[in-house]
Design a protein with these regions (language model features):
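N-terminal Rossmann-like FAD-binding beta1-loop-alpha1 element of flavoenzymes
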Residues: 4-31
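Short acidic, glycine/proline-rich loop/turn micro-motifs
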Residues: 41-44, 95-96, 174
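Residue-level detector of anion-binding/catalytic polar loops
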Residues: 28, 67, 127, 176
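Long, low-complexity, intrinsically disordered polar/charged segments
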Residues: 1-8, 33, 39-40, 142-148
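Conserved Rossmann-like nucleotide-cofactor binding loop
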Residues: 14, 37, 166
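Glycine-rich FAD pyrophosphate-binding loop
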Residues: 23-48
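Conserved N-terminal helical subregion
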Residues: 73-172, 179-184
Length: 184
């Protein structure tokens, strides 16, 4: 049975960023991911799933060591941002009001994930299990035990469920969740 400090289920933006930041602190990390994204090529069509990454998120990605990788891919600065509710209430932000060249960047989610995955490769204390999925989770007082669908058994002090809104890991741990559906 493999031992680790932290088992992270899901290597999306949240799981991969968390893995990099925890590994930088010297923790022994295992990352379990069912599938990895397609590699980046400049001539690929743009993905529709994008995020508005704030300057604070840029700082986090830089601390995780992934920002330099992202700068080699596609990103677009944004200078103004407006959000609104159904009742018409709107909030507007403008980088000029803050004396900043931009508020942040619009970046394809897949590219953020790829930059973080590339950074994860630099850490000898991160091991990735992919393609793999958790099929059993047992919680103990001092650790949790995970069984992966490839037969791997892991024992971790902490398990982080970063496997999305429909998290199987959260359900296996008996943790409920709630969602708010909003019209887009």
């Amino acid at each position: 049975m493999e031992q680790c400090d932290i088992a992270i289920v899901g290597a999306g933006m949240v799981g991969a960023a968390t893995a990099c930041l925890l590994a930088a602190e010297g923790l022994n990390v295992r990352v379990i991911e069912t599938r990895l994204p397609e590699h980046y090529a400049p001539d690929q069509p743009l993905d529709l799933r994008v995020s508005a990454i704030s300057q604070a998120s840029v700082a986090l990605l830089d601390k995780a060591g992934a920002w330099s990788h992202l700068q080699q891919m596609r990103l677009c600065p944004y200078r103004r941002l407006e959000t609104w509710e159904l009742d018409g209430f709107a909030t507007r932000f403008d980088s000029a009001d803050l004396g900043l060249p931009q508020l942040g960047y619009i970046i394809e989610n897949r590219l953020v994930q790829l930059a973080l995955l590339r950074r994860m490769e630099d850490f000898p204390n991160i091991q990735t299990h992919t393609p793999a999925a958790v099929v059993r989770l047992q919680q103990g007082a001092e650790h949790a035990s995970l069984l992966l669908d490839d037969g791997t058994e892991l024992q971790a002090r902490w398990v982080l469920a970063c496997d999305g809104a429909e998290s199987l890991t959260r359900r296996l741990a008996g943790i409920g969740g709630s969602r708010f559906e909003y019209r887009q």
